[in-house]
């Protein structure tokens, strides 16, 4: 009888140890999970601050607009002063003519790149800002002259999103692209020599706060 009670006592003690180990393990896992969430949340929340810090080296001030239709969706989309806002990007129309490579370098020095056009709506917005007597470099080029066009930010070149003028592109030696107004087809893309001088359009992603 005594042995049976001792055996039962050992069983209860062993069971308690198992439960204690399980509870401790769960607490440790929960703590690790919470810590991970906090680190991830902090990392995500820090992104606007880091981007703002980066832009501050190029621009002295930003203009921000309230975006979203509901209170819970409200956020601020910011662009540097004098840049145009559309969708998730900011655009700056250059007032100086330069070579394609120099134009890209000028954009990079402002935390941007030559414009990448992804939709017809974006093309239409951009052309509304342009002077019809000028042409503007885009961030599109064919470095090897083999007809493989590529965007400066490595966005895949889509055959469904292209706005060439009729009969363009027409020369393999013309390896860069400008957007220009030609009657009667209006605004469209034209392949040009990269060492010819044109105005340009810079693009950067908006900052969201």
From Swiss-Prot:
Residues 86-203 form the C-type lectin domain. The chain crosses the membrane at residues 21-43. It holds the Pfam family Lectin_C. The gene is Clec6a. GO terms for molecular function: calcium ion binding; carbohydrate binding; D-mannose binding; pattern recognition receptor activity. It is a single-pass type II membrane protein. Alpha-D-mannopyranose binds at residues 168-170, 174, 182, 190-191. A short stretch of the intracellular domain (AA 8-14) proximal to the transmembrane domain is required for association with Fc receptor gamma chain. Disulfide bonds join 64-78, 79-90, 107-202, 176-194. Residues 1-20 are cytoplasmic. Residues 44-209 are extracellular. Associated with FCER1G. Heterodimer with CLEC4D; this heterodimer forms a pattern recognition receptor (PRR) against fungal infection. This is C-type lectin domain family 6 member A. Changing residue 17 to V: Does not affect association with Fc receptor gamma chain. Ca(2+) 1 binds at residues 116, 118, 122, 203. InterPro entries: C-type_lectin-like (IPR001304), C-type_lectin-like/link_sf (IPR016186), C-type_lectin/snaclec_domain (IPR050111), C-type_lectin_CS (IPR018378), CD209-like_CTLD (IPR033989), CTDL_fold (IPR016187). Disruption phenotype: Deficient mice are healthy, fertile, with normal lymphoid cells, but show reduced survival after intravenous Candida albicans infection. In deficient mice fungal burden is higher in kidneys of mutant and in response to yeast antigen inflammatory cytokines and Th17 cells are reduced. It comes from Mus musculus. Glycans are attached at residue 131.
């Amino acid at each position: 009888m005594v042995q049976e009670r001792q055996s039962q006592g050992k069983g209860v003690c062993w069971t308690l140890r198992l439960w204690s180990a399980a509870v401790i393990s769960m607490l440790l896992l929960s703590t690790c999970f919470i810590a991970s969430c906090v680190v991830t949340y902090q990392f995500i929340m820090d992104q606007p601050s880091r981007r703002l810090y980066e832009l501050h080296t190029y621009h002295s001030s930003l203009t921000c607009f309230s975006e979203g239709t509901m209170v819970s969706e409200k956020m601020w989309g910011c662009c540097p002063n004098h840049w145009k806002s559309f969708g998730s990007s900011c655009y700056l129309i250059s007032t100086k003519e330069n070579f394609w490579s120099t134009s890209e370098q000028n954009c990079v020095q402002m935390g941007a790149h030559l414009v990448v056009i992804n939709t017809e709506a974006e093309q239409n917005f951009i052309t509304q800002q342009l002077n019809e007597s000028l042409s503007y470099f885009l961030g599109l080029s064919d470095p090897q002259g083999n007809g493989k066009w590529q965007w400066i930010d490595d966005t895949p070149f889509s055959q469904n999103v292209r706005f060439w003028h009729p009969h363009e592109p027409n020369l393999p030696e013309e390896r860069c692209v400008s957007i220009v107004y030609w009657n009667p087809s209006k605004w469209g893309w034209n392949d040009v020599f990269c060492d010819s001088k044109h105005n340009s359009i810079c693009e950067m992603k908006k900052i969201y706060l």
